[in-house]
Amino acid sequence: MDIGKTRARVRYVAAGGGGINVARGVARFGGRATAVHTAGQEIGQRLNRLLDEEGIDHVPLEIAGETREAFVLFETESHRSYHIVPRGPRLDDDEGRRCLDLIEQAAGAHPYVVASGSLPEGLLDDFYTAVAPRIRGTGSRLLLDTSGPALPESLHEAVYLRRCNRSEAGYLVGRAVQSFDDARAVNEQLLAAGATEVAITTLGELGALCSTGQGHMELHAPPLPGEPLSDAGAGDGMIAAIVTRLAAGDDPVDACALGVAAAAASMLTPGTEPFDREVAESLCTAVRINRLAR
């Protein structure tokens, strides 16, 4: 075993996290978004500066713990990428309450609210069941993209749209989700439970299944024009495209088609670098849609 230094080159440094990535993607598509996020200590202040420099509208919640830093390592010979995400700060009860209040206040200025990512330590698993009625009270619609124990707990409250990747969907139903048929069973379960109006289960290189009360739509991913470099941020790019098009008046299927294309475009950039809008819109024309009745 060789032991020594591994030299690295810093290619890209940016503010990140699910909601921030979505806000960046919305801006890339020409939409308007406000990122609501926590910021703690020195790294939290740097996060605020990065967002300001990038011109992303944001509302920080100051917390006692230090904001975490995540890393994507891209190995240039194998072209493999490794997403390293350390544990984040723990929020206390007061910070959790202030977080709810801040989300509700920001929601009033937007027709759609995206709740993205796993919950930080300190927040109860049922946090999103508290978020959902507050969002409804503002007249906004909630799009939920979460994972871990918060995912099944969130089913107790209806939202407008839910996105699960195949791993999260498998966690929900207790079995592997690998095909469009598997995804259809998951989406049917979510719709039948009244947990959502629109259910989206993503299937990696296959694409995604978008389901509503009117039927199921298989959205087959377009062929990539180049070698995939990283899947970090692909899900956030998808949600950004979907919410942008929903806010512009598109129906969920057309919005999801651009979402599948944005996820594909995200894979063509290394690390967490954002997708190219023109590439995403070009790939959207190659997304094949197969409509199935319920």
Predicted regions and their residues:
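Conserved phosphate/ATP/ADP-binding segment of small-molecule kinases
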Residues: 126-216
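Glycine-rich phosphate/adenosyl-contacting loop at the front of the ribokinase-like
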Residues: 1-36, 45-49, 220, 225, ...
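Short beta-strand scaffold segments in enzyme catalytic cores
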Residues: 24, 69-73, 207-211
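Short beta-strands and strand-loop turn motifs
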Residues: 83-85, 110-118, 145, 163-168
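Conserved phosphate-binding/catalytic loop of the ribokinase/pfkB sugar-kinase fold
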Residues: 73-109
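A glycine-rich helix N-cap at a beta->alpha junction
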Residues: 52-65
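Gly/Ala-rich phosphate-binding loop of Rossmann-like dinucleotide-binding domains
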Residues: 27, 136, 247
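Conserved phosphate-binding/catalytic region of the ribokinase-like
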Residues: 152, 180-294
